[in-house]
Amino acid sequence: MRLLILFLFLPLFPLAQKKKAPDFALGNFTDDYKITYTINDTLWIQHPNTKYHIIKWNKKKQYLVAKNAESNKEDANKYTRIDYMTFKNMEPYLWGFCLTVYDAATEKIAKKTAYVDRKNPKKGCNGYPFSRMRRVEEKVVK
């Protein structure tokens, strides 16, 4: 009986793991452009009003796929792929991201759209730099 219960719940574990963000990406941040963000395992908020509902984190390939919130003024209910990378010797910026695609019609299209160059973070985001993120004090998410 216990074995049967284990097998019934076993398929749920990989799903839970795919929604887990890397530790460095959790919290409150400001980027190079003074835009603020709050990020957790399931939600990426670009303050004040842009929200991405995270479907999957791919830690190995360093990207996430999200569905744009219905309330977003631009590209509502479309899909976004955000590629990220960590930095060395760029303190206080420890990591950065690229909105690789933000208006894909489907999750599958967003997932397959991959053209970042992490070897060149100054131009590796479709000719633009990765947005560098630095941690800031906590802000209450509403």
Where are these regions (language model features)?
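Sec-dependent signal peptide cleavage junction
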Residues: 15-27, 140-142
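Short, solvent-exposed loop/hinge segments that bridge or flank secondary-structure elements
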Residues: 26-59
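Generic cytosolic/nucleocytoplasmic N-terminal low-complexity/intrinsically disordered segments
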Residues: 17-19, 59-60, 66
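Bacterial Sec-dependent N-terminal signal peptides
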Residues: 1-21
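A broad, structure-centric signal for solvent-exposed, well-ordered loop/edge residues
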Residues: 7-8, 36, 46, 140
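Short beta-strand segments that buttress and anchor functional surface loops
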Residues: 30, 64-72
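Residues that act as N-cap/strand-start positions at coil-to-secondary-structure junctions
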Residues: 23, 31-33, 76, 127
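Beta-strand-rich cores of mature extracytoplasmic or soluble domains
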Residues: 70-142
